[in-house]
Amino acid sequence: MSKDIRVLLYYKYVPIENAKEYAAEHLAFCKSIGLKGRILIADEGINGTVSGDYETTQKYMDYVHANPLFSDLWFKIDEENEQAFKKMFVRYKKEIVHLGLEDNDFDNDIDPLVTTGAYLSPKEFKEALLDEDTVVLDTRNDYEYDLGHFRGAIRPDIRNFRELPQWVRDNKEKFMDKRVVVYCTGGVRCEKFSGWMVREGYKDVGQLHGGIATYGKDPEVRGELWDGKMYVFDERIAVDVNHVNPVVVGKDWFDGTPCERYVNCGNPFCNRRILTSEENEHKYVRGCSAECRAHERNRYISENGLTRQEWAERLEAIGETLTPANA
């Protein structure tokens, strides 16, 4: 079956004058050609993922490259059977990547155009993975790591990327004197984070140029030493990386069986991303905890039209009960 849709992943750090106005112009153009996706535009640059048919995505790439600021912008292209997005969003933000540092932190202003880690090609990164003296650090959110990661990479004890700088500071004595290489989905987070590590005093910091997305497409490494799938922030959720010897590393939240299917916890005040089968999603009413399963706002209940009696019976089947307030 031919794949008629292209998904474009890209970013570029470059100063953009009147970025807020440019974001509005950018959105108008994207809508005029029927493009779908999500784009962030800030004073420091642009970061986006978009999808459309061949003609639409080609028009978009030509439009972007026609701007002198983005004439050399690197598009990473996936071919798919279906659209990766349902709508088109272009938003102006203060930053395209937020490190989560305090406003008074002297390292708060990280400019990757001035300070960033050394770029590693996929081949060089693979060599780093095999080097016992090199620390490989995953800079993504916890749920991204759980779906797939490089073999031997460290999973920081964090929930999201914004917590990573503090985690690195808390563990500085473990890594300061070692070579550290970092990676993320497409490279945009690592550009800034590796620069922050250099500012923190790390002497030997590297980053996977182009991110996991590029590593999986490299004709020489072919994604080897990647385990699981790569989490992406669109309708696809998970994409293949390892084309040599792929394995499943994701585990069902409820029973630990191999799983690569993500859902959000039904409790809107939790919304945690969890891996689970369709069977367990229904069994546990899409709640990641007893509290979430019995929460009065659990979206699974309304989405599936469960009566309170049916809801209570589901919970009783797993040894739980609705709270008195919800009974």
From Swiss-Prot:
Transmembrane segments: none annotated. It catalyses: uridine(34) in tRNA + AH2 + O2 = 5-hydroxyuridine(34) in tRNA + A + H2O. The active site is at residue 184. Keywords: Oxidoreductase, tRNA processing. The gene is trhO. It is an enzyme of class 1 (oxidoreductase). It comes from the Bacteria. SMART domains: RHOD (SM00450). This is tRNA uridine(34) hydroxylase. PANTHER family: RHODANESE-LIKE DOMAIN-CONTAINING PROTEIN 7-RELATED, THIOSULFATE SULFURTRANSFERASE/RHODANESE-LIKE DOMAIN-CONTAINING PROTEIN 2. Its EC number is 1.14.-.-. One of its GO terms (molecular function) is oxidoreductase activity, acting on paired donors, with incorporation or reduction of molecular oxygen. The keyword Oxidoreductase applies. The keyword Protein transport does not apply. Belongs to the TrhO family. Catalyzes oxygen-dependent 5-hydroxyuridine (ho5U) modification at position 34 in tRNAs. It comes from Streptococcus suis (strain 05ZYH33). InterPro entries: Rhodanese-like_dom, Rhodanese-like_dom_sf, Rhodanese_C, TrhO, TRHO_N. GO terms for biological process: tRNA modification. Residues 130-224 form the Rhodanese domain.
